[in-house]
């Protein structure tokens, strides 16, 4: 049976509402996309995000001697790193491909980022054979990734695994553009989670690799927002850090999606790493509630009014001792670097995980 080269679904011309539908006039094309993938490629449209039973799919790899390429989002590492992959794939060897290097400041040395990735993986007892930093957008280090795969695969099957939206399909397309003259863009690419439905095996001269379904991560904030808001939240180019010197009893809004209250501490600097399209707005703590009530979905946008009505906010109070430079991370949004002793109240929406780590930058 012929399959869609975008998602791997079996093509059919009978039911437009079912997976794999294609107009019968197009089904005989050599590189055919189903209607859903066609809409995703041309309009970034996805009317139904499918939650795949990825545990069953990945478990099929357990009985194989394979190499796993685990692709993670450097800007949202902890939310896209999947330590359970080791268990689900039978303890097969793994390479970590840390994508979206281009979003982090160029001033940060690659070795520091690699050490950070290894440290975070080791905390979950996840031992990687190699860590490669990549950018599917700029094609940085794609050659290094392929060379590492060839080195460690040793003739075995290679599986690409990762959460939806980490750039897995874009990485594969980058490999194809660099190493294949015939098929320039055979994997569907979109900002919508869950666009790859089934295994897709691709043969190159020196090795073959298999794309697996993007893991639908229910903790990701993108699952609650429109594509327009997502495009503002997800950085498209190098982050421009915003340094703010704050007195205690000051508040900083990250659009309408997060609120940073400097509750107590001496005057100090905080560095905000978020998408350049998100507003970082400072005000007095005593004025913050009123400002939020007046400006949510206006100045503080995203979220839109419709999105805001469906969001739930929660808060945490965190104390920093100033002994180490730390990151206060809002998964899927960004992070704030804190270097001095202080007390912070952080508020954000359900779906965003609040946690701290040793500073990345």
Each predicted region: which residue ranges?
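Conserved beta-strand elements of the Class I
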Residues: 67-70, 159
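Short amphipathic alpha-helical segments
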Residues: 81-84, 108-110, 221-224
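Histidine-anchored nucleotide/phosphate-binding helix
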Residues: 80-93
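Hydrophobic alpha-helical positions that pack around
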Residues: 169
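Canonical P-loop GTPase G-domain recognition
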Residues: 93-95, 103-166, 177-178, 185, ...
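Helix-rich effector regions associated with P-loop NTPase G domains
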Residues: 2-68, 75, 92-95, 101, ...
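Switch/connector loops and helix/strand junctions flanking conserved nucleotide-binding motifs
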Residues: 79, 104-108, 142, 218-219, ...
